[in-house]
Amino acid sequence: MKRIVSALLALAAGAALQAAEVSVAVAANFAGPMREIAQAFERDTGHKAVVALGSTGKLYAQIKQGAPFDVLLSADAQTPARLEAEGLGVAGSRWTYATGHLVLWSPHPGLVDAQGAVLRSGQFNRLAMADPKLAPYGAAALQTLQHLALLKTLEGKLVQGDSIAQAYQFVATGNAELGFLALSQLLVDGRLRAGSVWQVPAHMHAPLRQDVLLLVKGRQQPAALALMAYLRSEPARSIIIRHGYAL
C-alpha cells in the first residue's frame, strides 16, 4: 500500500511540475468561447491559459512592441500572416480556428428588420461599430455600409469603439440604438439575446476568417503547444460552434 501511495504521489508531483501557463492574446469578439475553452483546457490538460483581450490591431501592436504572448487568436487571417512574415510567429503554425458572422443588433424589438432596411430609413441617432482600422469586424461593418452605398449618408451617426466589445457596450448601455456586432456576442446558452437582429449576408463584406498563430515566444512552451493542439479537439470545436462560429 505504501508503495502504491508513493507512486501516486510521484505521479501527482510530476503532473504539477509539467503543468504550465500559456499567455494568449485573444480578439475581443472571441471572449465568450475563449473563457469556456480556457476552463476546459485547464480541466483536460492541467495547463492554464492566461487570456488578454483586445482588438486585433491593438494586440498586433503589443506583440510588435514585445508583449510576452505565446499564442494569438486573431479576428482575421491577415494579422497572423503579417506577424509570421515579420518573424514574430512560428512559420507554418497558423490555421483557421473559426469563421465569424457579422450582425446588426438592437436591444429594441422591432427596430432592426430581417433585411436591415432600418439602415436606409435612418430612424436612429447612433450606429455603433468597431474601429475598422483596429478590428476586423469593424472593417466588415464598413464594407457593408459601402456595399449598401450608405456610408456617406450615415457617417455622421457612427460611433466607433476600439474593439467589438466596446461597440457592444455602446449599444447595451443605450449610447447607440443599434450596432454592428459579432453574432457570438449575442448568444447566451445558444439563444439570441432579446431585441432585433439582421445577420449581414456574407457577400457584403470580406470573410471573417479567424486564424490562430503560435508566436515565437511560445514555440518551446509545452502549454502553448498543448493549446494549439487543444483548439483542434472536439471539446474546443463544440464550444466554438455553440457560440455561433463556423469551422
What are these regions (language model features)?
Residues 1-3, 71:
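Intrinsic disorder/low-complexity segments
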Residues 3-16:
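Bacterial N-terminal signal peptides
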Residues 20-53, 57-67, 74-77, 81-90, ...:
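Exported/periplasmic ABC-transporter solute-binding proteins
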